Design a protein with these regions (language model features):
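Eukaryote-biased intrinsically disordered, low-complexity acidic regions enriched in Ser/Thr/Pro
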Residues: 1-66
Length: 66
């Protein structure tokens, strides 16, 4: 099973690109946090508390399987 990380944008969940998805998966497996490149900018991702900060906006993130 493959896993996909998504973030909440209003009432929809948006998938991260493949590069960011792999980086977030690594952070999650390490119970860690850090900066991830996504959508042409840097986002801080806290994979333990399941949120990201991008352009001073905090968004919920979650891990899905497909």
């Amino acid at each position: 099973m493959a896993f996909r990380w998504v973030y909440q944008a209003g009432s929809i969940w948006v998938p991260f690109d493949d590069r960011a998805n792999a980086a977030i998966e690594n952070l999650w497996r390490a119970c860690s946090h850090g900066n991830v490149y996504h959508a042409g900018t840097v986002a801080y991702v806290n994979a333990v508390n399941l949120y990201m900060l991008q352009d001073n906006v905090r968004r919920a993130i979650t891990r899905t399987g497909y």
